[in-house]
Amino acid sequence: MQRLNNVEFFNSPEGEVQIRDEKGVRTYMEEEKELTDALFSVIEIDYPQAFKALSEIYNKSKVNAPYFKYRCAHRFIRCNFGMYDKVPDVDELGRFNFENVACPLVGECKYYKVICNPEFNTNLTMREKEIVRLYKEGCKTERIAEILSRSVL
């Protein structure tokens, strides 16, 4: 299976999903089976609420598995990676960098914050998630301990 890394997705002015990676720039098509399979696996494992919603939306396509996977991946891309910018949507380590996509249904869509900017599946406790958030914000161990009223030792 293809590894997802250093990929930029964006929506063209014509409304097509475009891909920029080591192969160059091209339109995302159903024939991109390896990319679709890799993206689909990440969605299924790491974003189960988004996966469930996408499965419900494209339920009628399930009989044609490759097309079902493509439709789910295509929608996930459109809802999360719309801008062409200098920050890869999938970085060198395979981490997603979600973007705020210009969507006329923001706040009204029943899939808002489910498919777009989905919650990452983790077995971390709320306290552990808070530690990760503070670490991502650049806090040092001592500062995190201070904020959370904990001893470093």
Indicate where each model-derived feature is located:
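DNA-contacting interfaces and partner/effector-binding or oligomerization modules
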Residues: M1-V114
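Helix-turn-helix DNA-binding segment
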Residues: N117-L153
